Regions:
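ATP-binding pocket architecture of kinase catalytic cores
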Residues: 2-121, 125, 132-137
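Short, polar/flexible loop-turn hinges at active-site or ligand-entry regions and domain interfaces
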Residues: 74-75, 148-150, 170-173
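Catalytic activation segment of kinase domains across protein kinase-like and atypical kinase folds
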Residues: 113, 125-166
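Active-site activation/catalytic loop segments of kinase-like enzymes and analogous catalytic loops
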Residues: 156-194, 210-222
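ATP/Mg2+ or Mg2+-diphosphate-binding catalytic cores
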Residues: 212-252
């Protein structure tokens, strides 16, 4: 038996044991496992297969692939990568549209104004994508802890925010983008993959940025845990800067 910590997740208590990911169980885990099981039965091969729950942990099948991390992988920084990300977002959205949660499902964002809309992943950033480096394509979408209801198009706008990227050059350079950043070309490519106009996508990005920021700001020290942690470290300040950047880009 091998037992190795999931890269970058040691503080979250995640370990990989013989091809199974063991993660601490949350009050949302049963709902997420029902969703993941449904995705598997629906033929969506990019999400982890649920492998059980007990009182302390959830278990998921490990997905082979290259974790994104920082800086962004060369492929995702290419126009083909932006187009592939847009197509992925559309495919994910189309599949999730058919899902119906189990009765009494509890998601991490459980109730309130921010828990409305179709079920979505909730955190589709490059950091949760796995890549097949040899084939140059997305081979996995992990960390479904923030799955649940969200405004229509939330996942697509969220991913576009970081793939295009809709943030200032300093923040983009921290993620590995090299000047000059071809935001016009990347936005066009992402929209080609997703299937809407650039103006419509920019509206989605701002909507996703604002929704994410509001989820953080309305969190309390009692939860939801992920948003409470982000609030504690001041991520909302960075998001507000990104919202301003995106709106200025829209107006230019």
């Amino acid at each position: 038996m091998t037992n190795s910590p999931g890269a970058g997740f040691v503080d979250r208590g995640i370990v990989i044991v013989d091809g199974v990911v063991r993660r601490p169980r949350g009050y949302w885990s049963a709902a997420v496992h029902d969703l993941l099981g449904w995705l598997d039965r629906a033929g969506f091969s990019l999400s982890p297969k649920p492998a059980g729950l007990d009182e302390q942990f959830e278990y998921l099948q490990y997905i082979e692939g290259t974790g994104q991390g920082w800086p962004l992988l060369p492929f995702i920084q290419s126009l083909d990568g932006a187009r592939a990300a847009g197509a992925f977002a559309r495919n994910l959205e189309s599949i999730l549209a058919a899902y119906r949660p189990i009765k009494g499902a509890r998601w991490q964002l459980d109730g309130g104004a921010h828990a409305r809309g179709p079920i979505q992943h909730g955190d589709v950033g490059p950091w949760n994508l796995l890549w097949d480096s040899a084939r140059g394509e997305i081979c996995g979408l992990i960390d479904w802890d923030l799955a649940g209801p969200a405004p229509a198009g939330y996942d697509a706008g969220f991913l576009a925010w970081f793939v295009i990227p809709m943030m200032d050059d300093f923040r983009a350079h921290e993620r590995g983008f090299v000047s000059p950043i071809d935001r016009v070309g990347r936005l066009r490519a992402y929209c080609d993959g997703y299937g809407i106009t650039r103006g419509e996508m920019l509206d989605l990005i701002v909507s996703s940025q604002e929704e994410f920021c509001n989820r953080i700001l309305t969190a309390s020290e009692h939860g939801p845990p992920t948003y409470a942690m982000l609030k504690e470290v001041g991520i909302d300040e960075l998001i507000r800067k990104d919202i301003l950047f995106t709106r200025q880009y829209q107006a230019s």
